Regions:
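Exposed, low-structure sequence patches enriched in small/polar residues
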Residues: 495, 535, 579-589, 599-635, ...
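Well-ordered alpha-helical scaffold segments within catalytic/enzyme domains
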Residues: 296-315, 319-333, 379, 390-408, ...
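Active-site lining segments of carbohydrate-active enzymes
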Residues: 369-381, 393-473, 522, 534-544
Length: 682
């Protein structure tokens, strides 16, 4: 790497062509200062600011990655802002901005008060908002220019990143402008606030931080980002996450699942959506077969584990309480019997033939398509493709599992057939299974990826049908048409609108498509499906935390030494972490197995390890009582954001017991244990 001074405050880094330009400035007492001299050596640059001090850069060329270690040596007392400014030769072409887990295609799809290009052309975001600190990428159709930083370890040095005309600027201390997004309904105007400063004492201050730069020939933005992550992973620390052992993890998760089962008063059962959530518990007063509760998947897990013998007192007690709750014998069929009662409960959700509304309001005795928090309450009386796809897939699996315990349950398969017929007839000419449908099979909303769950459901049902069954041919035709549509979404990068409690670009859109493509590949082994799956997998990587982000040491998460590495964030609308990574890990392992691309196996391992954290045990119930053993919080608020706009619950706070976390993580664990057991070795 050659270093050329191009102005009194700038140097250009070159190899065979221009790599980037570095600008050296300091802000002292509100005024921008430039160096009086730049001292350039073979692999270092020193900017001399006279009595203020120096900035010293050491450069390390690691192939396609440049590692820049910067030391600020500040000698004069006062207020400072530190800037790290990178730019590249963009040939005056328009740059598109990408920030992992935060800014995708200008965030212009959806509804909500989250940051977008429509609200402002320029933004600055704190490093704690993105899955790699201060990571941002500019693409101009010819090059991909990316920067990132190691995480801050002190609140004073938490940085922010903002795009510039030809580059990116990292500032310390960080600030968010022109707005700070702090909750689903909270976008705080910060345009009139003074920028924060670093107060340097009379004895001076030295501070060192490492930055990472990449300048790639343009492939796709997401492909370039994945390459950047792969290069960075070779340099990042490999500290293991502190979590409980898998045997106890499994027992406690099953304990929580059993304790969520409720008797409906008529001998049937459902899963409680969540409990003990204080001031926001009213939000959780419904159950469902799918999505936020996943009662039917929970039933499938119970049925599959009916012969499992407990090793902990907590699990034994949960089984005994369950038997008492339903006046059953605590034997090897207990969990299967209760699973059947859950399945039977949701047979009531069929409003007319093949029209399935699986959300049930426990207070008002109302069935609906989706009754939770969302941006579109007008859809509650319709049926949703995601909910139907999830529920029917689990009905098929539950019927097969109960059969192994001697329980023939043809009503579940009959219902699945009727719902399948509904979607075969409703499927749009494009191949889409839509999003929201009226009871008459008319589309209410066709945007997003919800219909991919119908594709996965069909892939689960098809192997059970005989070749003489006319439904089989119809389903095969439908999934092929659906693949044409959803593969085009993946090609266009249109990963949008999958979660029902938000309306934005979200990671679950990528997971839905990846799962469908892999399910269809498992059925037919068409290599084209793996190409489409790669596009979805690349999109998902941005939501996986690659570093341990800064957490205030005195916060709940900080006190528990919680690590963000391997955790996943939700969407551009929901800036919190969750444990969805167990489900993603299984899909990544399938993809890696079929393609040999071990990058995705490595990413899967990160997520699996992260999901061992923060599970309530017999000795630590995470602030609750022993009836919550096995609960794991849904929302981990690592940054300045909270779902319900509660300012006290930001930056290191965890909260919300909700059934989907228990069900999804336990079910994914079972799949990984069956198919990829080596990934669970401790």
């Amino acid at each position: 790497m050659h270093i050329l001074q191009t102005s009194p405050e700038k140097v250009e880094l070159r190899s065979s062509e221009s790599f980037c330009t570095l600008a050296y400035t300091l802000t002292f007492e509100g005024k921008r200062r430039t160096p009086c001299a730049l001292i350039i050596k073979e692999a270092s640059i020193t900017a001399d600011f006279g009595p203020l001090g120096t900035i010293e850069d050491r450069l390390l060329d690691r192939g396609n990655l440049l590692v820049l270690t910067r030391s600020w040596n500040l000698r004069q007392q006062g207020s400072y802002r530190l800037q790290v400014a990178f730019s590249y030769d963009d040939q005056e072409l328009e740059n598109k901005l990408f920030i992992p887990a935060l800014w995708y295609q200008d965030n212009n799809k959806g509804k909500g008060c989250f940051p977008s290009a429509e609200r402002s052309a320029n933004w600055s975001f704190l490093e704690t908002r993105m899955s790699i600190p201060c990571c941002a990428q500019l693409s101009n159709g010819q090059r991909l220019f990316t920067c990132a930083s190691e995480p801050a370890t002190d609140q004073r040095f938490v940085a922010s990143v903002a795009p510039d005309r030809h580059g990116l600027i990292i500032s310390i201390p960080g600030s968010e402008w022109p707005y700070s997004y702090q909750g689903k309904q909270s976008l705080v105007d910060t345009s009139s606030l003074a920028l924060p400063c670093l107060e340097v004492p009379s004895q001076g201050l030295s501070y060192t931080r490492t930055f990472y730069l990449s300048n790639q020939k343009a492939g796709s933005s997401l492909e370039g980002y994945c390459q950047f992550v792969q290069q960075l992973s070779e340099l990042s620390p490999k500290d293991k996450t502190e979590g409980i052992g898998w045997e106890h993890w499994f027992e406690y998760k099953l304990t929580r699942l059993i304790n969520l089962v409720q008797n409906d008063g008529n001998g049937l059962a459902y899963l409680l959506m969540g409990e003990g959530n204080g001031e926001v518990q009213d939000v959780y007063a419904f159950t469902s077969a799918s999505f936020l509760v996943k009662s039917l998947q929970g039933a499938q897990e119970l049925a599959s584990l009916t012969k499992y013998q407990p090793k902990t007192k907590a699990l034994a007690a949960a089984r005994a309480n369950l038997a008492t709750k339903f006046s059953l014998v605590d034997n090897h069929l207990l969990l299967a019997e209760v699973a059947k009662r859950i399945g039977d409960f949701f047979l009531q959700a069929e409003r007319s033939e093949g029209v399935f509304q699986d959300n049930y309001d426990l207070v008002n005795d109302i069935w609906g398509g989706y009754l939770g928090i969302g941006e579109h309450p007008e859809f509650k009386s319709m049926v949703n493709s995601r909910c139907n796809g999830e529920a029917m897939k689990q009905y098929v699996l539950l019927a097969r599992t109960l059969q192994k315990s001697g329980m023939e349950e043809l009503s579940y398969l009959s219902l699945a057939r009727r719902v399948a017929r509904f979607y075969c007839e409703a499927q749009l000419s494009s191949g889409s299974f839509g999003r929201w449908w009226t009871e008459k099979g008319k589309p209410g909303d066709i945007q997003g990826t919800n219909g991919a769950y119908i594709g996965s459901f069909f892939c689960t049902l098809i192997p059970l049908l005989s070749d003489e069954d006319p439904l089989k041919a119809d389903l095969l035709s439908a999934v092929h048409q659906a693949y044409s549509f959803y593969s085009e979404l993946a090609y266009e990068g249109a990963f949008y609108g999958d979660t029902l409690d938000a309306d934005s670009c979200d990671k679950e859109a990528g997971v839905a498509l990846l799962s469908f493509f892999l399910d269809l590949y498992d059925l037919e082994h068409d290599k084209r499906l793996l190409e489409s799956a790669k596009l979805a997998a690349q999109f998902i990587v941005q939501w996986i935390w690659q570093f341990d982000s800064f957490l205030p040491p005195g916060s709940e998460l900080g006190q528990r030494n919680f690590r963000t590495r391997g955790m996943t964030s939700v969407s551009v609308a929901h800036h919190h972490l969750d444990f969805y990574g167990m489900a993603i890990a299984y899909e990544f392992l399938r993809y890696a197995h079929w393609t040999g691309d071990m990058f995705y196996q490595e990413q899967a391992k990160l997520m699996i390890e992260a999901c061992r954290q923060l599970v309530a045990t017999e000795t630590d119930q995470l602030g609750r009582d022993e009836t919550y053993i096995g609960w794991q919080p849904e929302q981990l608020n690592h940054t300045t954001w909270e779902y319900f706009n509660r300012t006290h619950a930001m930056q290191g706070y965890y909260d919300i017991d909700i059934a989907w976390v228990t069900v999804l993580t336990l079910g994914s664990y079972q799949l990984i244990l069956e198919k990829f057991p080596s990934m669970l070795e401790e």
